[in-house]
Amino acid sequence: MNVLLGVITKSLSDLEKGLAGTLNMTQAIEDLIAALTISEWPGRNPYSQCAWEKFSWPSKKSLLPQYADMIKRHGQLTSWTETLATPISVWLSGLFNPMAYLTSILQVTARATGSALDAMTQETHMTTYKDSHAIPPDSTFPENGAFIHGLFIEGARWPFGDEVEEPYEFGGAKVGGFLLESRLKELMPPVPVVYVKAVLVQPSWEPSAVGYLRHVDDVYEAPVFITTARGATYVFLATLKTVVPKNKWTLTGTALMMQQDD
């Protein structure tokens, strides 16, 4: 983050000097002007010499939404470093390397249980907490895992509040619900706080290039992506409860996203 802020500060300073005539206009400055003119995050054009995109996280947002996103990310990191205490729920989407945080959950659990790290993976459980502010103040970290928030779902939705049928306690967290069909005109609704738990890999699970497939009828393995571009922005597999055949969600392309496009 500090590197990105430094790059932005210097490029804007150079732009100011260039417009004032105290610095020669370089191609990088011209590319910066071109991006700002069309409200594009500078450097997203592959031919641009402006370095903002190079030091940023994957995103499809336009200039103002991504700038606001950057301020929010900086706020989380600043708060975290000031207290040196892990938040009760981490905004996973706000990390430059979300997979590193998920791996740390596995590492802590492996160390605590004496298990081999490569014999562990993660599973997810949707809580009944609408957002991080809904987590009770006296809550502790869930068993062998952590809370994350800020995810969205595409191709389905997850129930909130009274829609959640028969919530129950699991690992020190209140969880419940299952995948439901999307509402009309609701393209990417948010999901509740997610409980990510480190678990031992079971012999019946099938290893694949994207994670372990459980082959359980009531669990849909939903890919989690950083952006709606999917593909190279893949992070991990989330395990979501379903009461209908899970191939329904495969056909609808149901997946979790870490950020919306706007």
What are these language model-derived features?
Residues M1-D262:
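Long C-terminal appendages of very large multidomain proteins
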